[in-house]
């Protein structure tokens, strides 16, 4: 897949006139135009990283809008295996992309992009959508429980179904959100119940260790960041998202949306991503 280019050519007319009297006649003015071009402005590739208990399809509405607007979009799988491993895999994927990148993370995806982008000169902007924006040593657990209001701050056995990983540590199982909790956590009443049921059915598990692994040095100290905050978020309370966004000096918008704002408010999310993309030019 090749990068899309937008070329802008500017013409500067340089008129060279010659006026000569020949008997009773007058010579006509002659004009010529020289073409001058500026370097092409390259739209960045937008990399959309999904969060826990989801897959790349959670970005479908946003991806379609970005593609309509001329952006190359990719939604690589997030392994949901732990911050370090997930960041390493994303970093390897980013290495295959030529040209500037806008890196977008939803929810747990924010943990991953913050670690994966560190030192990557191709990543020109970070965009956090209802996401964790960690500093060094932060964990998903510590950020989730920092302020009241998260559904996931409850006793784990009331929120998650636990499935042992064959050959793995029994204390670190895969976690699935209970169907009875899924809608309350992710969608509120903004998504029809039948659609919530489908999302819950196809959820991908998050490894328990992903909740407690510490983040490394954050990329947002050197890469400008943007954020979208859903004010009805029941996973990461809006107050916590605001605090993290301020700490990262992110360009922030707040919208009336649940945790899945890219599903319920794809237009607002797309606009914020494109604002970040335009700022990279």
Model regions and ranges:
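Flexible "cap/lid" loop of the alpha/beta hydrolase fold
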Residues: 122-123, 127-169, 207-210
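Conserved loop-alpha-helix segment in the C-terminal half of the alpha/beta-hydrolase fold
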Residues: 230-257, 263, 276
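Post-His helix in hydrolase/transferase enzymes
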Residues: 263-279
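Active-site nucleophile elbow and catalytic-triad environment of alpha/beta-hydrolase enzymes
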Residues: 198-219
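Gly/Ala-rich beta-loop-alpha elbow adjacent to hydrolase catalytic centers
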Residues: 104-109, 113
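Short beta-strand/loop motif that positions the catalytic acidic residue
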Residues: 221, 227-229
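Active-site catalytic motif of lipid deacylating hydrolases and related acyltransferases
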Residues: 38-99
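Secretory targeting and sorting signals
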Residues: 2-32
């Amino acid at each position: 897949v090749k990068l899309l280019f937008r070329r802008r050519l500017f013409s500067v007319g340089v008129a060279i006139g010659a006026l000569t009297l020949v008997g009773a006649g007058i010579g006509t003015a002659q004009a010529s135009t020289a073409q001058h071009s500026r370097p092409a402005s390259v739209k960045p590739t937008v990399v959309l990283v999904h969060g826990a208990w989801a897959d790349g399809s959670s970005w479908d509405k946003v991806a379609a809008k970005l593609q309509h607007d001329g952006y190359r979009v990719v939604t690589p799988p997030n392994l949901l295996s732990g911050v370090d491993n997930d960041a390493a895999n994303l970093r390897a994927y980013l290495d295959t992309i030529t040209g500037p990148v806008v890196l977008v993370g939803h929810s747990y995806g924010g943990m991953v992009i913050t670690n994966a982008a560190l030192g990557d000169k191709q990543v020109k902007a970070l965009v956090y959508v209802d996401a964790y924006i960690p500093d060094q040593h932060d964990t998903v657990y510590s950020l989730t429980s920092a302020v009241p209001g998260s559904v996931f701050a409850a006793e784990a056995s009331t929120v998650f179904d636990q499935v042992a990983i064959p050959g793995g540590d029994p204390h670190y199982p895969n976690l699935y959100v209970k169907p009875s909790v899924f809608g309350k956590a992710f969608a509120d009443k903004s998504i029809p119940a039948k659609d919530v049921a489908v999302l819950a059915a196809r959820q991908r598990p998050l490894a328990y260790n992903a909740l407690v692994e510490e983040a490394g040095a954050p990329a947002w100290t050197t890469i400008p960041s943007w954020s979208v905050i859903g004010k009805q978020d029941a996973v990461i309370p809006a107050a916590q998202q605001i605090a993290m966004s301020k700490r990262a000096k992110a360009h922030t918008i707040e919208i009336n949306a649940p945790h899945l704002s890219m599903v319920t408010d794809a237009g607002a999310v797309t606009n914020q991503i494109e604002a970040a993309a335009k700022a990279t030019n």
